[in-house]
Amino acid sequence: MAFDNHQKDVRDRFPALQQEQVFFDNAGGSQTLDTVIDSIRDYLSSTNVQLGASYAVGKKSTAAYSAGYQAAAKYINANPDEIVFGASTTQLLRNLSYALKFNPGDEIVVSRIDHEANIASWVDLAERQNLILKWWKPAPGPNPQLLAKDLAGLLSSKTRLVTCTHASNILGTITDVRDVADAAHSVGALLCVDAVAYAPHRPIDVKAFGVDFYCFSWYKVYGPHISMLYGSWSAQTHLRSLGHFFNPSATLEDKLGLAAGSYELLQSIPKVVEYLDSKWDKVIAQEASLQYELLSYLIDKPNVTIYGVPNEHVSERVATISFSVKGWNSKDLVEAVENKSTYAFRWGTFYSDRLVREALGLGKDGVVRVSMVHYNTVDEVKGLIRALDEVIGNSS
């Protein structure tokens, strides 16, 4: 397959792309940048010691770890004291839910169309602390959206927390979190945002977003299998520390880290930041081309239902596109295409069961999801379209 020079330069940075498999399952985890792989190997080869030691290799290890914190914080426009790393977004949000302190009868508002990572912890919190749980439920249909104006009837002087996604891992739809933050803050509530499906596609500025807590996974942003949670200094006043009694509790890492930030993975984050910092305009433009190509095909198929915003506007969606085909079970369709091609994409509910079953009205096999990122090419999308068309044809 031929690539233009820029796209070839991009793809050359990802060793996994130098094989026949075509990756359209990027929402489940992106491929890893070459310098990240090298950094992890080098750390384990020469600096794999406990942090804080005074000997030479110990100092080098500690410096690399600290550089990871510095780079990650700067990347999202935060301070190092405001971030913590962990094994997954699910784990970090669960830790957060155990650290937050509210009073019986206080209210929390939880989006019902999120990934379960940003739902289950809050349902559990409400049960443990005798809180009133209010569901933020967009109307059922193929394009449910989280809009700040729909919060009006859910917020009150007793609201303490609002939770939502920045971009749906099924729909690809972008939530205006600044509007949601303003609405939540108008009644003195905190806002917690799951940005896992947003972070691979757009730059992040937590101060501009106005969020109190913000979480995403670096392994979906071309990096190592590690996740990160931001908590503003003011929001941290609502937290108790989960750490040992004799340890400090000043930073978010002190409060929630529980020694879960793998050293070799965390210290590789500067390589991701270095790669992305100068590329965002090209990333967004490339993904716009990809989603335009696929959506144009799907829109013209009368037997296809697209879920989420049915256009390629980058202000409204990211390049995660889900659909179903009349007369086809999603599992059977994906496997039929995979049996005839090298295209890797998925079917299912992707841990957004409430969204898929309630809002979209689908069963356990859920949607067909094609999730693209900037290292994918228009030619790859055209190839997938041909493979899809061979299977679903002109049936209606």
Show which residues each predicted segment covers.
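Pyridoxal 5′-phosphate
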Residues: M1-S396
